[in-house]
């Protein structure tokens, strides 16, 4: 079993947590939001239970220690920290075949910020 943490910027804000909370609220009356919310939560649970030992349609290594969870058209970036923890960084809705470079760069910047503040 692994520990999953949500990245928070230096002001204590987690965009991913806020996004999931918004989806959870919308899911009461919106079927698409309900499906997205359940998929993302399931994939986070799979990561927590199995680590990166999941099929590539669930998780994929991108580069430089940055991974992505792949629930539907959503992508949730994360990295492994201290061997038994995963830090969930941010998400975006994938609209093209290739993951946009700016999203990967943002994930790397968030990871570097986390490591600078929390330590290797």
List each language-model region with its residue ranges.
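Basic, Lys/Arg-enriched alpha-helical interface segments
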Residues: 1-73, 83-85, 93-120
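Short, surface-exposed beta-strand/loop micro-motifs that present aromatic residues
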Residues: 76-79
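Short, conserved beta-strand/beta-arch hydrophobic-aromatic motifs that form part
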Residues: 90
């Amino acid at each position: 079993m692994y520990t999953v943490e949500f990245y928070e910027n230096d002001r204590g804000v987690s965009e991913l947590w806020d996004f999931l909370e918004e989806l959870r609220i919308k899911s009461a009356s919106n079927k698409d939001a309900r499906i997205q919310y359940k998929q993302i939560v399931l994939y986070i649970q799979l990561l927590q239970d199995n680590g990166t030992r999941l099929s590539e349609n669930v998780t994929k290594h991108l580069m430089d220690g940055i991974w992505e969870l792949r629930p539907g058209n959503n992508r949730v970036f994360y990295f492994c920290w201290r061997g038994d923890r995963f830090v969930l960084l941010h998400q975006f809705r994938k609209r093209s075949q290739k993951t946009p470079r700016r999203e990967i760069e943002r994930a790397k910047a968030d990871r570097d910020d986390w490591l600078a503040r929390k330590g290797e």
